[in-house]
Curated annotation (Swiss-Prot):
Family assignment from sequence similarity: Belongs to the isochorismatase family.
Full protein name: Triuret hydrolase TrtA
Residues at which triuret binds: E72, K132, V157, T158, C162, Q202
GO terms for biological process, alphabetical: amide catabolic process
Residue numbers annotated as active site: D24 (proton acceptor), K129, C162 (nucleophile)
Functional description taken from the UniProt entry: Involved in the degradation of triuret (carbonyldiurea), an impurity in agricultural urea fertilizer, and an intermediate of uric acid oxidation endogenously found in human urine and in prokaryotic metabolism. Catalyzes the hydrolysis of triuret to 1-carboxybiuret and ammonia. The product, carboxybiuret, channels into biuret metabolism and is spontaneously decarboxylated to biuret. Extremely specific for triuret with four, three and two orders of magnitude less activity with biuret, 1-nitrobiuret and formylurea, respectively.
Length: 227
């Protein structure tokens, strides 16, 4: 077992029963000129974590973990997007409308693609999710159960919305979740900090948190003991 120094207490897992879930590292959310910046958000906090997420992906791949990527996306006819969701945010630029990188949050559009430097490789799962949580209206739970996954490492954007929602969904389904705190981000840094505190309050009510460096140290120690 790999032991990681974490909050609120050490987290333990085995690579064979663990998946890395990278949430919504999409061009429209992270790049200048995308949907996120068109709504008036400062995308720099999200762009800043890209190297950390890339390093996390490398670690997971080298350790032999399952890697899962999610994209918040909808069918071109928006049949999986309720009216209540379409009306949220800036009413002049909504889901399905043509934005700077094609139709917003629609499958197959340029802005809906995962950043090239974080692109999935052969054998990794890509989950197109119509909601904020990675488990809602997807087959993610079935895919994880089929592979006997019990533990999840979680990263991505935004911390307070899709990352938190996915962790809570996973917790309700029995997964032990560790969020990599410097591999997540929000347009609002205070939201990021407070969400991490919420997830790990009361003895880890939803899960654990740790920086990438602690994860790397734990994996390196395990590898040294099990060459």
């Amino acid at each position: 077992m790999i032991r990681i120094d974490a909050t609120p207490y050490p987290y333990q897992f085995h690579p064979r029963s663990t998946a890395l879930v990278v949430i919504d590292m999409q061009r429209d959310f992270i790049e200048e000129g995308g949907f996120g910046s068109a709504l008036g958000n400062d995308v720099r906090p999200l762009a800043a974590i890209v190297p950390t997420v890339a390093a996390l992906l490398q670690l997971a791949r080298e350790a032999g973990m399952l890697v899962v990527h999610t994209r918040e996306s909808h069918l071109p006819d928006l049949s999986d997007c309720p009216r209540s969701k379409r009306l949220r945010g800036n009413p002049t630029l909504g889901i399905g409308d043509v934005g700077p990188m094609g139709r917003i949050l629609v499958q197959g559009e340029p802005g809906n693609q995962i950043l090239p430097q974080l692109a999935p490789v052969e054998g990794e799962l890509v989950i197109d999710k119509p909601g904020k949580g990675a488990f809602y209206a997807t087959d993610l739970h079935a895919q994880l159960q089929e592979r006997r996954i019990t533990h999840l490492l979680v990263a991505g954007v935004t911390t307070e919305v899709c990352v938190q929602t996915s962790m809570r969904e996973a917790n309700d389904r029995g997964y032990e979740c560790l969020v990599i705190e410097d591999a997540c981000a929000s347009y609002f840094p205070d939201f990021h900090r407070i969400t991490l505190e919420m997830l790990t309050a009361q003895g880890g009510i939803v899960g654990w948190r740790t920086p990438l460096a602690q994860l790397q140290a734990g994996v390196a120690a395990y590898t040294g003991e099990n060459p």
